């Protein structure tokens, strides 16, 4: 289904009946990533809402270089558009968790409960790899723009960005500037503003948003519980759906 929200055409789903739950997907994913979780929540008596963020799935690119703040505003407007008066919980994975953190901390999202699965938002300390990514990304734009290199532009960029260790940036395409705007924002200071009960679900072997991020969030969010799923990675709800659902229930 489609709905116009803040001037953006949004692909969304609404299923079930009962208390409202909103699911927010991660970077590069779509609303379909939560098919299994949505089905479970519907069976347990919930109305489940989910949508493709602008620039992902079937929702067009927003047309501008958005930051996390614009995605928060879009999410708040979606809730209003759906006429959700009381949101029992909002659950998000990775980038979706980033949107939840900023949205709740600023009072724009007001769920009764938060479920953050491998949530992004903690900016890592500078490392050689991160510095290399920044330098190589800039160099890549300059080098591949030189006369005579037009034919090898894409291949050279791929090698440069892969050397920098950022497949997400390489795969971002038209979303590259939004990706940059997103990852450069550290949300640590926002965590202290969250007062709602918060469940943190983390994969033991997550390398994208490491378990140390979950522990930092647990320290800063007053009513946070951290559940670590053994052997699971970044996509914790796929790697061990049973353990993830048990924690959420």
Describe the role of every protein-language-model region.
Residues 194, 200-202, 206:
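Short beta-strand/loop motif that positions the catalytic acidic residue
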Residues 207-213:
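Conserved alpha/beta-hydrolase "acid-adjacent" motif
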Residues 92-96, 100:
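Gly/Ala-rich beta-loop-alpha elbow adjacent to hydrolase catalytic centers
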Residues 8, 13-58:
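Conserved HGGG/HGGXW glycine-rich cap/lid loop of the alpha/beta-hydrolase fold
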Residues 101-106, 111-145:
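Flexible "cap/lid" loop of the alpha/beta hydrolase fold
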Residues 127, 139-196:
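Conserved alpha/beta-hydrolase catalytic His-Asp/Glu region
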Residues 238-249:
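Post-His helix in hydrolase/transferase enzymes
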Residues 43, 47-91, 246:
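Active-site loop/oxyanion-hole signature of alpha/beta-hydrolase fold enzymes
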């Amino acid at each position: 289904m489609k709905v116009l929200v803040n001037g953006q055409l949004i692909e969304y789903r609404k299923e079930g009946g009962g208390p409202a739950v909103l699911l927010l997907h991660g970077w590069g994913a779509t609303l379909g990533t939560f098919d299994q979780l949505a089905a479970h929540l519907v069976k347990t008596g919930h109305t489940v809402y989910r949508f493709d963020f602008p620039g992902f799935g079937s929702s067009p690119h927003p047309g501008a270089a958005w930051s996390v703040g614009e995605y928060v505003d879009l999410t708040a407007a979606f809730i209003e558009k759906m006429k959700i008066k009381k949101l029992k919980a909002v659950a998000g994975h990775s980038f979706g968790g980033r949107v939840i953190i900023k949205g709740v901390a600023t009072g724009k999202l007001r769920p009764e409960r938060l479920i953050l699965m491998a949530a992004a938002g903690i900016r890592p300390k500078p490392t050689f790899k991160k510095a290399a990514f920044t330098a190589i990304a800039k160099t890549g734009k300059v080098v591949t723009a030189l006369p005579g290199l037009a034919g090898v532009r894409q291949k050279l960029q791929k090698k440069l960005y892969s050397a920098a260790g950022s497949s997400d940036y390489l795969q971002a395409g038209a979303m590259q500037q939004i990706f940059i705007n997103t990852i450069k924002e550290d949300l640590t200071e926002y965590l202290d503003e969250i007062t709602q009960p918060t469940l943190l679900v983390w994969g033991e072997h997550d390398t994208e948003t490491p378990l140390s991020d979950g522990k930092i969030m647990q320290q800063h969010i007053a009513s946070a519980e951290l559940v670590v799923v053994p052997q699971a990675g970044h996509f914790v709800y796929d790697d061990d759906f049973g353990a993830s659902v048990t924690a959420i229930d």
